[in-house]
Amino acid sequence: MRFDDSKYRKRFYPLSRLKGVEDLRVGIFTFGERLRKLFGETEFIFTPNFVPFEGLRENAPVILVDGKVVGFNPREVKGWEEAEEFARMGRALEIRGIFFENFWELPLKVEAVLENDLKMINLEGYYKIGEIYIHRTAKVSLKGEFGGWGLIDEGAVIKPFVVLEGGVYVGKGSLVKPFSYIVSSVIGPVCKVAGEISHTVFEGFSNKQHGGFVGHSYISSWVNIGAGTEVSNLKNTYGSVKVYSYEKEGLVDTGEIFLGMFAGDHVKIGINTTISTGTVLGIFANITAKDSPTEKFIPDFYWTGGGKMSLEKAIEMAMRVMGRRGVKPDEGYIDKIRESYG
């Protein structure tokens, strides 16, 4: 099995700026992890931006989800154009699932994906409190309110007076601090979170350790959100939210009423910053309260007040931050940072 995100990768910028679309998280798994679990033995080439709800029921040269071509067998089909032709001729297998067209859809379908992902987990090492499965190595205070459903994974820590509602996943080695209120969200591995979090995905290795609100947002890896940061996820007019598209090089109307922020890898947000509805923050963007309320688009490598971070400082910061979690970026990763800098 191989991935080819060339058609859609720019649609998921800045989230996919330093990694493939297959490495984006929605639910318990990344796109790639889920596809490997279901289709690991196949020879298919996949565009990874979809969540299958079932495996292959029968052999087929082309696979569809939501009417979109998501994969083909290179032994029978020469490429994506021919795969589209096969689909038009009715020579494709439609499977149940969710297809993601754009980055802003990721936090909006958390519960549907999470419900499906739970069916893929071997729950032998878990016990239940209400409708939440808890790994036996997790440390969970019972002085909380667990009215939701979902899964708390291996080595996670839930401190006292935490409220969990809706579908919630807390990833391996992550910490939820006291008095947190989490609704319909995914907290990926090795995160530290606090405050109010609603309909949001934390990809992994990112922190929001203090009070403040984040809603209908996607937080990439190696992001730090300072104390008192408030993210608007609803316009005062209750109108449709526009977001910046790297693909279109301008604002596009999403048709959605609730959208917060979309932060690329290595974003740093200072204390008491106010994030405008539907803000897109490019990789390595560094903003503070002086940038509040934020513009709709904060470009890659932005430095608070209107400057630009040097490439050397960005690489130095990445190595320092990742090193604190025992992760050493390889040359390929550093090269992607250089290429993104331009």
Model-derived segments and spans:
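Short, flexible segments with low predicted structural confidence
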Residues: 3-7, 82, 146, 163-164, ...
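Short, functional N-terminal and low-complexity linear motifs
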Residues: 1-4, 80-85, 140, 158, ...
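Extended beta-solenoid/beta-helix repeat architectures
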Residues: 121-220, 235-236, 262, 280-281
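Glycine-rich hexapeptide-repeat left-handed beta-helix
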Residues: 179, 193-342
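Terminal amphipathic alpha-helical/low-complexity segments used for targeting or macromolecular assembly
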Residues: 1-131, 297-342
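Surface-exposed loop/turn and secondary-structure junction residues enriched for glycine/proline
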Residues: 15-18, 27-29, 103, 109, ...
